[in-house]
From Swiss-Prot:
PROSITE patterns referenced in this protein's UniProt entry, alphabetically: RIBOSOMAL_L9 (PS00651)
Function: Binds to the 23S rRNA.
SUPFAM superfamilies: L9 N-domain-like, Ribosomal protein L9 C-domain
PANTHER family found in the cross-reference section: 50S RIBOSOMAL PROTEIN L9 (PTHR21368)
Claim: Phosphoprotein is one of the keywords in the record: no
Protein known as: Large ribosomal subunit protein bL9
Keyword Amino-acid biosynthesis among UniProt keywords: no
Cellular component annotations (GO), alphabetically ordered: ribonucleoprotein complex; ribosome
Length: 172
């Protein structure tokens, strides 16, 4: 038999803080109650529910504002990656979500895996790509990622003569 609960925190896939939800007894007993993410709903929890909903609304407004600011910042930023390629311009490996998060951190932008709706997203081709992001409070943003080949490999393919080689050729 399912139990009615008052959520104290947002629980993904179940509800948000202040919501009264039903959940299976094992989930309640083994996860929600021990981690203090919920309490069993009763007559005395109505005041707590009102307080939690008010706090959630304030937090949601702040999160939405913060997410919209971040979306505006991300609109103007291009993350650039230099990767090794073979002579046919095929990449060795790929640019993964972890690489994008690390590069964004260098620019003081905090992203997590939760911001990427496609968790196994990987860029395997050269060029500019638009990466969709999901921020807090259902705000979406697009991050531009530009992947280009390393200049050192291009130099190996098209070697520039050194000054010594140029001088030797002029003497001949």
């Amino acid at each position: 038999m399912k139990q009615q609960l008052l959520l104290l925190e947002d629980v993904e896939g179940l509800g948000r803080s202040g919501d009264i939800v039903t959940a299976r007894p094992g989930y309640v007993r083994n996860y929600l109650l021990p981690k203090q993410k919920a309490v069993i709903a009763g007559a005395g929890t109505l005041r707590l529910q009102a307080k939690l909903k008010e706090e959630r609304l304030l937090r949601a407004a702040a999160d939405r504002e913060e997410s919209e600011k971040l979306a505006q910042i991300l609109k103007d930023i291009v993350l650039e990656f230099q990767v090794r390629v073979d002579p046919d311009n095929n990449m060795y490996g790929s640019v993964t979500v972890s690489d994008i998060i690390a590069e964004a951190a260098k620019k003081n932008i905090v992203l997590t895996r939760k911001n990427f709706p496609h968790a196994h997203y990987a860029i395997k081709n050269l060029g500019k790509k638009s990466v969709p992001l999901k921020l807090k409070e259902d705000v979406t943003a697009t991050l531009i990622v530009e992947v280009s080949s390393e200049s050192s490999y291009v130099a190996v393919l098209n070697p520039q003569p050194s000054q010594e080689q140029t001088a030797a050729e002029e003497l001949n």
